[in-house]
Amino acid sequence: MVDKATTERKLKAPLSGRKRVPKKTAHACNYCHQAHMTCDDSRPCKRCIQRNLADSCRDAPRKKKKYLMDIPDEVADPSAQQLTPDAVMGPSPSTMTLSQSNAFMSSAADLEYSILGNIIHQDSGQFVGTDGTVISPSISTSDDNSHITPLAHYNGAIQGPAVYTKSPLNFEGSYAMTPIQRRTDINEIQPDLLRSEPSSNDTFGPTLHGEEPSCDSSTNQYFIGPSFSSDGRAQTLTFPYVVSQIERTKRYNPKEFRRRNKKSAISFSVGLMTDESSDKRDESITGLVYHEPSEIYSKIKRPYSYPQYYHSLILYLRKRFDKESLVAMSKAMAEYRPSFIAGTMNLKEDDLIFTEQCFQRTLLEYDNYISISGTPTVVWRRTSQLAYVGSEFCVLTGWSKEQLLGRSTFIVEILDDKSVLDYFELFSKIAFGDFRGATMTECTLLTPDGKKIRTSSIWTLKRDVFGIPMMVIANFLPILT
């Protein structure tokens, strides 16, 4: 049995007399790790100094987590980067001059021969250029810009970029992107700097159109829709344009781009017009011909000329598609054409006038909901002629309401070839066969520049009092995964 007095003497003994236990570190160096020996926090560690291995003492590489597998080691583990004496002292003047010159010439060449809005990820196949390859908003965290489309292939004003990254929210990649600046930063940048040529000091590179999209850096959320420029002018930031600006940030500041992406995946917030500005807007440009129910019943005196627009649709399809595609569309039309004929053959002129009044009255009612829904929405007739375009749809695609409603425009004109074929097949199924009249589908929208935006959409078919398809209400959202 241990004597109590002996135990007390040991406890009261000075600490210096005890054997010192080396403090363990959570991360051993490569040599101590291989030898399974205790290491310390200093670099080089004491054991490496004793063995004359101080120059090569590094933290042992750790096994990467799955979500970091495609990120370079120097980014995933900054501690792996060790400062050498040369790095501490800095490069010589001649080296510094040469590297700065090369950086400037590289940026200038990139500006001349590439357009950031047409970056296409080689594996994702999403947002596309005019050559037909698909472009969906997908952002790449890679620094490889070899797949940038030459500027000569770009002939539009609004950028429609691609964006790809392997983060929680993936735009077939993902939109885990970098906010370019805080909202207040936009007003702090000098206009002449925004339009200047890129240089070694131009961190973010040249600004397209001289404006940066607003972004909440704390949530990585970009703002699209109606806004004001730095000089107070009203403007609309479209989805394709904002994506192109994100790609520009990724190109000119890739390290900062990756760092910010770790915070959260990108998201978008669609701004709404203020009450003051909405009162001043021309409501007729949405597609509404009548703004009061009394106007509808007093001014509509003739039926709508559906046959005329069917002929216009057929002429357009013949100009755009080859024979094989036309045959496929004709087969789909042949399925519902007899039902249309049977449903309308007994209708009188007053009935046809009444159906047009119902169409305009329904459109007027839907305008109240669409204008506050915040979802990109369009409405078209059974001839596929656009009858109503929501403001959010213009923000999503880059089309203006004047372009879509200033003339007779068909929904198939802003769909890619595959989506047009799918449209007729889908319409033939829901026109008379599916009395629920609503279906989810995936389609690809075209921007004014010919780029493609993959979207998921829901189409709701509305019938008139005679059971004949009257209009299709379609809601679109860009595909992020």
Swiss-Prot record:
One of its GO terms (molecular function) is DNA-binding transcription repressor activity, RNA polymerase II-specific. SUPFAM superfamilies: PYP-like sensor domain (PAS domain) (SSF55785), Zn2/Cys6 DNA-binding domain (SSF57701). SMART domains: GAL4. It comes from the Eukaryota. GO terms for cellular component: nucleus. Gene3D superfamilies: Zn(2)-C6 fungal-type DNA-binding domain (4.10.240.10). Residues 29-57 bind DNA. One of its GO terms (biological process) is carbon catabolite activation of transcription. Residues 193-217 are annotated as: Disordered. Keywords: Activator, DNA-binding, Gluconeogenesis, Metal-binding, Nucleus, Transcription, Transcription regulation, Zinc. InterPro entries: ERT1_acuK_gluconeogen_tf, PAS, PAS-like_dom_sf, PAS_13, Zn2-C6_fun-type_DNA-bd_sf, Zn2Cys6_DnaBD. Pfam families: PAS_13 (PF24990), Zn_clus (PF00172). Residues 362-434 form the PAS domain. It is found in: Nucleus. Transcription factor which regulates nonfermentable carbon utilization. Activator of gluconeogenetic genes. Belongs to the ERT1/acuK family. This is Transcription activator of gluconeogenesis ERT1. The lineage of its organism: Eukaryota, Fungi, Dikarya, Ascomycota, Saccharomycotina. The gene is ERT1.
